[in-house]
């Protein structure tokens, strides 16, 4: 093996601790699509989605399979005071999309339910906070665009370690249930300085050009 690519400095350190030569490990981040390195216009993206560009926007991403109690999460969020909107993604799960849409009518124009999208970067460009499971790619995409996260339902193992890492870095908080989610988002919204620090931490940890970095290392190694 001529080289390795690591998602973070800590992973590179752990690889070295297992005997892998340090000079063969390159910290590039997880490769993601180049669109996440672009600066997208929030107003234009919001108009495409039919949402207000100037309202605080929570993006709920529970994965295509959804999570137990996703509708309860939305109902708790809708109970928060303030001028905000929720964009809830259901992926290709038609039943989940139908469940989310059943809540739209009584949301007072604050809930927008979407199915699968191939342009998630344009949805993220409209958001101020993501409520999501801490999967590797989702985390990498949020980091790249500087989107703070409230983490829910991590799978034991890798997702739990992802959550721990982000919380240690001040880039995310974790909610164990719907009540905790409501409480923590209310706290974040009421503390704009903390919100700003989280966004800065996200951008500092992000590797929007990870794919290019990997490619450059590979091509240079072949010369």
Residue ranges, per PLM feature:
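A nucleotide-sugar donor-handling region in carbohydrate enzymes
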Residues: 1-64, 92-93
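Donor-nucleotide binding loops and adjacent catalytic segments primarily
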Residues: 40-126, 160
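Short alpha-helical segment that forms part of, or immediately flanks, the ligand-binding pocket
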Residues: 121, 139-145, 164
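Acidic donor-binding loop of glycosyltransferase active sites
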Residues: 125-135
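A short alpha->beta transition loop at the rim of the catalytic pocket in nucleotide-sugar-dependent
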Residues: 127-128, 146-148
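C-terminal "capping" alpha-helix adjacent to the active site of nucleotide-linked donor transferases
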Residues: 168-170, 176-193
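A short, well-ordered alpha-helix in the C-terminal region of glycosyltransferases
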Residues: 194-208
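C-terminal alpha-helical cap of glycosyltransferases
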Residues: 207-223
